[in-house]
Amino acid sequence: MRILPVIDLAGNVVVHAVAGQRDAYRPIESMLAEDATATAIGSGFVKHFGASEVYVADLDAIGGDEPRWELYRALAATGLRLWLDCGLASEKRAALLQKATEHEPIISRFIVGLESVKSPQEIRSILRVLDAEQVVFSLDLRNGQICNAHDVWLEMGAEAVAATVLEMGIRSIIVLDLAQVGMGRGVGTLALCRTLRDMSCEWELIAGGGISHLENLSKLEQVGCDVALIASALHDGRLTSEKLSAAGFSFP
C-alpha cells in the first residue's frame, strides 16, 4: 500500500485539519519544516519521506474561490506533483483546470468531492472535459453519513453512490469521513472500504482520516485499500520514514 501525504491549504498556509471544522483550523506545527508555508511543508515531505506526489485540498477554492495557480506552481517546484482538490464541481471549472494545466503538467489527478457536486449529472459533465483516468472521486462522509445536502445523493447511500461513479468510468475512489480527520483515533470506514473492494477489484481504493499508527495502515491494507491519505501523523513524528519503510509502506 502506498502513502500519499496531504496538505490542507487555507489562505497562504498549510493548516491542521481537525474533524472537518474548517473555521477552527490553525497553521500546522510540523517537525518537517520551520514554518507552515506550502513550499516548506512540501519540501519537508520530499526531504524526509522521498515523496513525489501530494494531495492538496485548497479549502478556499473548495469554498468557492478561484484556484491559486501561483501557489500550486510553487508547491510543484519542490518536486511534487499534485492530486488537486479545488472544488471541481462543474464542466466550466473542469475546462478551466484543463486549460490551465495543458502546457504545465503539475497536476497528477483532479479530485471531484461528493460534498461539492449537486448531482451525478454534474460528474458526467466534468467527464466530458476530463478523462476519467485523471479523475478521483472522493466519497465524503461525516459521522458515517453522506456529506451532501442534496436529496439525490442522500437517497442513494454510500454504496449506491460508489456504484454510480464506477459506472461512469471513474476508477479511483477516496473514502473519507471528515469527522475523523486529524483526530488520530483510527479509520472508521473499514467496513465500507471492504464492501467497496468486494464490489469491484477494478478501482483504486483510497482511504484516510484518523490514521495515526502502523496498525491503522495494516487494517486498511487488509480490507483492500491501495493508498492511504495521511497528514497529522507525518507532521508530529508518529509515523516516520523509517517506521513506514520497515513495515513495507511506500510513497509514490
Region roles according to the model:
Residues 33-47, 91-96, 153-164, 217:
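Short, acidic/polar
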Residues 14, 18-61:
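N-terminal beta-alpha supersecondary unit
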Residues 2-10, 54-56, 82-86, 110-112, ...:
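Hydrophobic faces of well-ordered beta-strands that scaffold small-molecule active sites
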